[in-house]
Amino acid sequence: MSEHSPQGTGANVPASDSPLADALWAALGTVEDPELRRPITELGMVERAQAVSEEDGGYVADVKILLTIEGCPLKTTIEQDVRKAASTVEGITRVQVEVGAMNADQRNALKSQLKPERINPFTAPGALTRVFAVVSGKGGVGKSSMTANLAAAFASRGLAVGIIDADVHGFSIPGLMGIREAPTRLDDLIIPPAVDAPREHGQVRGGAPGGFVKVISIGMFLKGNQPVAWRGPMLHRALEQFILDVHFGALDILLLDLPPGTGDIAISMSQLLPNADLVLVSTPQHAAV
């Protein structure tokens, strides 16, 4: 029997003396967490990976993965991806996967790995993310549709894109992007849901692989048609949390879908993200400009 048994989240696992175990670990390294978009081997999600010999001369891949939270909605997807990856290893004739969940210490280690400090990653020294605020003078001119289409276009070119739906009182981005699931919460760290770049006939439009869009919206935290009656400081704190406590990871582009006009939200965003470029959406009507 040969195995890799990493200790701790994000551990660098030394090469074993078994080529089969190394090949199994390398195969599992091609599996990414669908939300974090990083290999599960880097995130400490593989507790056990071993190749066990069988009587017929083949080997069974015995793998245990740890989900970030109990009841993770992506359990089936991750398990299927692990099975598929392990089955590609030459010499592996059967795959068995055990699924567990991280304990508190493992989650804390993961949080420290993902976001060691509560800082604004988009204004920090060396930040490379290009930030665009999509704005309009009035509602109903297609601002949110423009935001969603820009995100899809950027992602189709292989870029990592984030959207903050800052239109708190008229959020629509989750629906436009086809996102129904809620964000994953690691205590006070929020992991936004992600969608892959648009595809046509199985191919990413534009031919560039790897693009995706991560979305956060107040609508993901509300039940049904629950209204939002926030103003001033409450709005600022909510938007600040979207920037400081949401782990987008390394983004090429961040899009802000702002509400129409120049109210509290626009003022807060200009303070939180002063480096944002503006994309003004309008129609030919005088009232829109």
What are these regions (language model features)?
Residues E42-M45, Q50-E55, A61, T68, ...:
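Extreme N-terminal, non-catalytic leader segments
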Residues S87, A151, A155, S270:
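Gly/Ala-rich phosphate-binding loop of Rossmann-like dinucleotide-binding domains
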Residues S2-E47:
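N-proximal, solvent-exposed amphipathic alpha-helical segments enriched in charged/polar residues
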Residues L28, V46, C72, A86, ...:
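Residue-level signature of catalytic and energy-coupling elements of molecular machines
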Residues F154-W230, H236-R237, I243:
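Phosphate-binding loop that captures ATP/GTP phosphates
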Residues R107, D245-F248, D252-V289:
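Conserved catalytic-core segment of NTP-binding enzymes
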Residues S2-G10, Y59-I69, F132-V134, D277-V281:
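Short, hydrophobic beta-strand segments
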Residues R130-H169:
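Walker A/P-loop phosphate-binding motif and the immediately C-terminal alpha-helix
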